[in-house]
């Protein structure tokens, strides 16, 4: 028998420090990781002029690659449905 590992998509949270909505989204993602397989990458938009211009104060944004999944608030049902396609 092989030891196959399931693919775990990496979800990116575009965030900045001192952003309470960002902190809430990240905490919610950590809770979902208890039952769903995915990795989280947090990107501080203030470290990139391009990202700061793109998002400004319109954060947090949750994305998988170029696909935006949620903006401002985590949508657990929509994210669960999206991630079910990777099982």
Where are these regions (language model features)?
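Local sequence-structure signature of Cys/Sec-based thiol-disulfide redox active-site neighborhoods
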Residues: 2-31
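Short Fe-S-cluster ligation motifs
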Residues: 47-60
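N-terminal, polar/charged subdomain of small-to-medium soluble alpha/beta proteins
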Residues: 71-75
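A short, hydrophobic beta-strand/beta-hairpin element that forms part of a small beta-sheet core
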Residues: 59-68
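Thiol-based oxidoreductase modules, predominantly thioredoxin-like and allied folds used
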Residues: 38-49
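Short helix-capping segments at alpha-helix termini
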Residues: 33-37
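Thiol-/selenol-based redox modules, centered on thioredoxin-like
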Residues: 78-87
